[in-house]
Amino acid sequence: MSEQSSVVVIGAGLAGTEAAWQVAKAGVPVTLWEMRPFKRSPAHHSSEFAELVCSNSFGALSSDRAAGLLQEELRRLGSLVIQTADHHSVPAGGALAVDRGRYSAALTSALDDHPLVTIRREEQLTLPDPDQIAVLATGPLTSEALADDLRAFTGREDCHFFDAASPIVEGESIDMTKAFRASRYDKGDADYINCPMDQDQFLAFRAALLDAEQAELKDFDQNSATFFEGCLPIEELARRGEDTMRYGPLKPIGLWDPRWGDVNDRDVRRAKRAYAVVQLRQEDKDGRLWNLVGFQTNLKWGEQKRVLRLIPGLEQADFVRFGVMHRNTFLEAPELLEPTLQFRRRPHLLAAGQITGTEGYAAAVAGGWLAGTNAARLVHGHDPMQLPHTTMIGALTHFISEAPSGKFQPMPPNFGLMPQLQECIREKRARYGAYRDRALADLQRTIDESQVDNVVCTA
């Protein structure tokens, strides 16, 4: 081991939780700092680790999808956070979604019970000493004091965009005489509740969205607010055009209520098909709570209740959580980070999670895995590792460290980040399958060569 025989991890979100676990699993003592519950961000509701503040979904499960491939790579690397998500999953069609409460509680208990993990429930006001091996995993809602110190260290103003979370309603309050259970194109079980609209209902709903009063966002210019395109507020989609929502979260294609008649009868299909459909996804194991898919919003809470109750089936909906919007901060990673997630100016300091400019839950976990693994390797006196560019994790970390600087924006996992295949495959699913096969083969080779400890450990 090096003279520095312990690691500090700041932030117990998805990335910090994974990082701390990987450090401890490598036999290295780790101190995990988390400011909650004594100081909360605008988006958090609990003091549990790895709280999911937006959706409860990690994205598609299928490994020929970008998010699904990222999840599968993490499973094979022994990710605690992903394996725990598998254990606490709820029905969500072809996606990996979890019971938020049980999921976060399980991860909190796993770290609390680990003999090498020390938890400090207080705010970290400054970056650790330069000689301290540390992982910065404070997320997009980094506290003001630490953000100020980070700006002083990097010599740069942080970048930011605005993100939002969807409302959640009680399942018993949904009128199932108007709504119906189904998954799109009948894939898998009928895991979603669907609220169909005709054209008049949709236009009235859109008009109400456009007229609704928004909550005031602090510390930013309303006219220059930047949103992440993958998580736009529903009212922003409404502003972009009459059909924008219908080609986004409210698209009706592939959803049919058997009460309408025979879907294979063309005349029935033309007469009965919905103009738009609002989908709700299960939040908990018992199916008592449901979130409105794609309904991130910054409307005032009273306005949310008024407008969302215009949706057929939700006229008497009981809201257990309203949508909120918050500022997301991220680093100018191409200027600051190596593909190992070390800061170029301070190799003992690593960054992980959404603060690095990756987008999505699974990407945050991936950053936590790599930063935690490399922090432990530094303690043991080993060189930090990179994952192959042909893996989804490697493609993401290479992108954020090598992208053109100046206009850097958060990036979700996608196959466009990966090196092209040697052979030309025109059919998309087959092409994505080939990307997957190459990625998993190269990942296994790296696991074998680097002696990665990928023992399955679930909370």
From Swiss-Prot:
EC number from the UniProt entry: 2.1.1.74
UniProt KW keywords: Cytoplasm, FAD, Flavoprotein, Methyltransferase, NAD, NADP, Transferase, tRNA processing
NCBIfam families tied to this protein: gid_trmFO, PRK05335.1
Main location: cytoplasm
One of the Pfam families matching this protein, by short name: GIDA
Annotated positions binding FAD: 11-16
Keyword Cytoplasm: yes
Superkingdom of source: Bacteria
Protein name in UniProt: Methylenetetrahydrofolate--tRNA-(uracil-5-)-methyltransferase TrmFO
One GO molecular-function entry: tRNA (uracil(54)-C5)-methyltransferase activity, 5,10-methylenetetrahydrofolate-dependent
Reactions this protein catalyses: uridine(54) in tRNA + (6R)-5,10-methylene-5,6,7,8-tetrahydrofolate + NADH + H(+) = 5-methyluridine(54) in tRNA + (6S)-5,6,7,8-tetrahydrofolate + NAD(+); uridine(54) in tRNA + (6R)-5,10-methylene-5,6,7,8-tetrahydrofolate + NADPH + H(+) = 5-methyluridine(54) in tRNA + (6S)-5,6,7,8-tetrahydrofolate + NADP(+)
Family according to the record: Belongs to the MnmG family. TrmFO subfamily.
Places the protein is found: Cytoplasm
InterPro entries in the cross-refs: FAD/NAD-bd_sf (IPR036188), MnmG-rel (IPR002218), MnmG_N (IPR040131), TrmFO (IPR004417)
Purpose: Catalyzes the folate-dependent formation of 5-methyl-uridine at position 54 (M-5-U54) in all tRNAs.
GO annotation, cellular component aspect: cytosol
Source lineage: Bacteria, Bacillati, Cyanobacteriota, Cyanophyceae, Synechococcales
BP GO annotations: tRNA methylation; tRNA wobble uridine modification
Co-factor(s): FAD
